[in-house]
UniProtKB/Swiss-Prot annotation:
Name of this chain's protein: Small ribosomal subunit protein uS15
GO BP terms in the entry: translation
Role: One of the primary rRNA binding proteins, it binds directly to 16S rRNA where it helps nucleate assembly of the platform of the 30S subunit by binding and bridging several RNA helices of the 16S rRNA.
Organism whose genome encodes this protein: Teredinibacter turnerae (strain ATCC 39867 / T7901)
InterPro entries the record matches: Ribosomal_uS15, Ribosomal_uS15_bac-type, uS15_NS1_RNA-bd_sf
HAMAP family registered for this protein in UniProt: Ribosomal_uS15_B
GO cellular component: cytosolic small ribosomal subunit
Span list, region Disordered: 1-25
Keywords: Ribonucleoprotein, Ribosomal protein, RNA-binding, rRNA-binding
Keyword Ribosomal protein: yes
Compositional bias segments (type: Basic and acidic residues): 1-18
Underlying gene: rpsO
Coiled-coil segments: none
Entry's family note: Belongs to the universal ribosomal protein uS15 family.
UniProt entry tagged with the keyword NADP: no
């Protein structure tokens, strides 16, 4: 269910702000979004998996906090990321 190393590398390369950037809010939000999207497919098949659902809710909350942080720091970066990831807001 977790992202493979190749998938993570591709996401990091797409959203990083510099060559060595792996922890900026944009990268973290993109990784969380990919994990959330992957888990949603899991729940289509396993509706009663409440333990994993708890992890999903935790990821969604963490992404929400990071989005709020980014919005407070730089609205332009926030808007660009929302549009790039296709998140509704």
């Amino acid at each position: 269910m977790a992202l493979s190393a190749q998938e993570k590398d591709a996401i990091v390369k797409e959203h990083q702000t510099s060559e060595t950037d792996t922890g900026s809010p944009e990268v973290q939000i993109a990784l969380l979004t990919a994990n959330i999207n992957k888990l949603q497919g899991h729940f289509a098949d396993h509706k009663q998996d409440h333990h994993s659902r708890r992890g999903l809710i935790r990821m969604v909350n963490q992404r929400r906090k990071l989005l709020d942080y980014l919005k407070g720091k730089d609205v332009n970066r926030y808007a660009a990321l929302i549009q790039k990831l296709g998140l509704r807001r």
